[in-house]
Amino acid sequence: MEIKIVRNVLEANNKLAAEIRQRTANSKTLLVNLMSSPGSGKTTLLEKLIPMLQAKGYQIGVIEGDITTTMDAERLQPLNIPIVQINTEPFGGDCHLGAELVLPALDSLDLANLDFVFIENVGNLVCPAEFDTGADVNVVVLSVTEGGDKPLKYPLMFRVCHLALISKTDLLPYLDLNLDLLRQNMLQINPKLTIFPISAQRGDGLADLRDWLIKLKR
């Protein structure tokens, strides 16, 4: 019975995810799901990346996921973009956003006038990988401070993602991290994974990321 319940939950989520994909396909909106551990730099990345997309004429929306607080959404307010906050605490404090939460959030956005919508998922390397949000692109952000073994310890996250961002590369001179080995570990789990080293603080790699997303949008 327990296995059946789990299967039913995932099946229900997948049906809603398919509905989300149909909706964003109709509006020609690229839905991007950002996943990572807490503190990997997702919000800082959005603070720097969104203006770069806006400078190219693209309209952006954000769905902010956290267990509690609106702190990350408040950081993005100066960008003058539509932001929908989802706090999971009222729903049991889930450590992920599922399609059942993303779908009503999309109802609050004018998708017809948005080119990109970024989901900033709840900080966790486990749960978010298990639930399809309906995103067109899954992105994992892994900071250099987390070590090179994370792809091997949390393989599902890297298996379900299309893109891996190795963040905070400006800290590499202060760390004992083998960047080539980290790449190898990522590709061992997912040989099709695209990998960009980035530093949101310095701007390194952000132009490549912007262009990669724009190419997908076209």
Predicted region positions:
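Walker A/P-loop
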Residues: T43
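Nucleotide-state-sensitive switch-loop elements of NTP-binding domains
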Residues: I3-Q22, N26-V32, S40, L49-A135, ...
